[in-house]
Design a protein with these regions (language model features):
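Amphipathic, Lys/Arg- and hydrophobic-enriched alpha-helical face
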Residues: 23-43, 55-59, 85, 127, ...
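Arg/Lys-rich amphipathic alpha helix in sigma70-family domain 2
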Residues: 64, 74-97, 179
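The DNA-contacting recognition helix of HTH DNA-binding domains
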Residues: 28, 42, 46, 70, ...
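Short, small-residue-biased leader/transition segments that mark boundaries at the very start
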Residues: 1-8
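A short, charge-rich alpha-helical start-of-domain segment used by transcription regulators
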Residues: 12-33, 37, 43, 193-201, ...
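The N-cap/first-turn positions of alpha helices
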Residues: 28, 137-138
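Amphipathic helix-loop-helix modules that constitute alpha-helical solenoid scaffolds
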Residues: 88, 95-137, 143-154, 161-298
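Structural recognition of an alpha-helix C-terminal capping motif at a helix-to-coil junction
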Residues: 47-54, 67-79
Length: 298
């Protein structure tokens, strides 16, 4: 890949190394959840993570990746965020004429070895991105960006909108979450149920982007299909009696079970009748069939 010319507002990740791309795409949502849980300020946290990803792109490509990539990202993103929060605090003090405040523990960077995934806050982040203050289109775009780790270009292609329009939509969505005073807490059962339809749509789009990638050299991006399946399983654990959730998880498992056999050595699609069925994932198929059977029995 080559590096395109970048606008200052375009903070998506462009990487030369495919393995590093997969690593950063997997780590970014985890780092974001840590920052939002610790500091709040979802919009500022998301910007800080994107800046850390750009820093990783430049530094890792030159010097190689650090021993603990997630801790590196967390440290860099935390420092960027803290700098921004301090600047905002200083600006408010100047405007209000208030005496300088003592820094509190929230404005101190966490240690580099702080666990990124002590708690799996993915679902909390997912439902936050589907906040009712946002339009359905904004909910989809923001979740694909923050939780799915897709770039602006990939999301724009998935939603069939111009990239510039999509970037503005994401920016407005983050501002609306801030204006609504949304907190990084799990929604109550009724709120959760109201947002579930959008959540499932988002998870399906993430899976679909991974199963038939719209960009890059690979037809299949297993890190995206695996992440979509993982999060959908978390949602299923949360609402095990919901037939739509079970059906979506079954669809993902049964579809992705054939991934190793659907492309030949030349990268061309292999029709199902010609696929080597010994390469299908029998465990995933069994799990998918069991989900369907349980859903039909209820």
């Amino acid at each position: 890949h080559s590096f395109p010319t970048r606008r200052s507002s375009d903070l998506d990740v462009v990487l030369m190394d495919r393995r590093q791309e997969d690593l950063l795409r997997d780590a970014a949502p985890q780092v974001l959840t840590v920052l939002v849980r610790r500091y709040g300020h979802f919009d500022a946290c998301e910007d800080a993570v994107q800046e850390a990803l750009l820093a990783a792109t430049a530094q890792w490509g030159r010097d190689g990746e650090p021993e603990s990539p997630r801790s590196w990202l967390l440290t860099v993103a935390s420092r960027r965020l803290i700098d921004q929060l301090r600047r905002e605090s200083a600006r408010r003090r100047r405007e209000d004429g208030v005496a300088a405040l003592e820094p509190d523990e929230r404005h101190v960077a966490p240690p580099a070895d702080e666990a990124v995934a002590v708690h799996d806050d993915t679902l909390t982040l997912l439902f936050l991105c589907c906040h009712p203050a946002l339009t359905p289109g904004s909910q989809l775009a923001l979740t694909l960006r923050a939780v799915g780790g897709l770039t602006t270009a990939e999301i724009a292609a998935a939603l069939l909108v111009p990239e510039a329009t999509l970037a503005q939509r994401i920016s407005r969505a983050k501002q609306r979450i801030r204006d609504a005073g949304a907190r990084f807490v799990a929604p109550a059962a009724r709120e959760r149920d109201d947002r579930l339809t959008v959540v499932l749509q988002v998870l399906y789009l993430i899976f679909n982007e991974g199963y038939t990638a719209r960009s890059g050299e690979r037809l299949h991006r297993p890190e995206l299909t695996a992440e979509a399946s993982r999060i959908t399983r978390l949602v299923h654990d949360l609402v095990p009696d919901d037939g739509e959730v079970a059906g979506l998880l079954a669809l993902m498992l049964l579809t992705d079970a054939r991934s190793d056999a659907r492309v030949d050595a030349n990268g061309l699609l292999v029709p199902i009748p010609e696929q080597d069925r010994t390469r299908w994932d029998a465990a995933a198929i069994a799990a998918g069939v069991e989900l369907v059977s349980r859903a039909l029995a209820t």
